């Protein structure tokens, strides 16, 4: 068996993250929030492509806060994840994840790894497969100490920002070329 790096610890998922149970009922709550549905989250990128307003919805939604991690539990093979940049509500098919022994910025990148995706795809349902938290919560992962989580999340965040800026530049050049 391989020895863990210094400071790293093996934890079950249920010990490093939890799923929020806060709900928004449009029939009882009058506050208006941005509402994220699965179709608003781009697969494999963490990019949000729009939202609706909670005043326009009729079903109960999950509540999330800025900095929490959203993960699409329906059809987990689509790899839909988002690090919330605002408070809002989302589809009940999206888990709102909160770090317990991990910081949320690290958690956002943690759920993108192949190992996490693999266990998320051991799902319930044939036609509409969903990630199974009761199964997933018992799986163990090796987790770095807090200071290393911060370094990892910071480095990956800088790479994401660079990629996002590069994509914007390419899109601008494409628009410019079409305009000529």
Where are these regions (language model features)?
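Short amphipathic coiled-coil heptad-repeat segments
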Residues: 1-8, 158, 165-180
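Alpha-helical interaction elements
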Residues: 149, 164
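Non-catalytic DNA-recognition/assembly elements of restriction-modification systems
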Residues: 1-25, 142, 146
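A short beta-sheet element
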Residues: 58-114, 132
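A short glycine-rich beta-alpha junction/loop motif
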Residues: 6, 74, 89-95, 124-147
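Sequence-specific dsDNA recognition surfaces
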Residues: 14-25, 31-66, 84-85, 89-90
């Amino acid at each position: 068996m391989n020895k863990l790096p210094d400071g790293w610890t093996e934890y079950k998922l249920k010990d490093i993250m939890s799923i929020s149970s806060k709900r928004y009922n449009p029939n009882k709550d009058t506050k208006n929030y941005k509402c994220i549905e699965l179709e608003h989250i781009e697969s494999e990128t963490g990019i949000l492509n729009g939202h609706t307003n909670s005043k326009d919805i009729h079903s109960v939604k999950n509540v999330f806060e800025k900095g929490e991690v959203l993960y699409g539990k329906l059809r987990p093979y689509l790899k839909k994840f988002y690090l919330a940049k605002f408070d809002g509500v989302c589809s009940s098919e999206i888990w709102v994840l909160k770090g317990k022994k991990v910081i949320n910025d690290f958690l956002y990148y943690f759920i993108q790894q192949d190992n996490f995706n693999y266990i998320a795809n051991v799902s319930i349902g044939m036609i509409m497969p969903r990630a199974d938290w009761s199964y997933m919560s018992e799986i163990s992962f090796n987790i770095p100490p807090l200071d290393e989580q911060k370094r990892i999340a910071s480095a990956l965040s800088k790479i994401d920002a660079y990629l996002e800026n590069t994509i914007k530049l390419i899109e601008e050049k494409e628009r410019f070329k079409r305009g000529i």
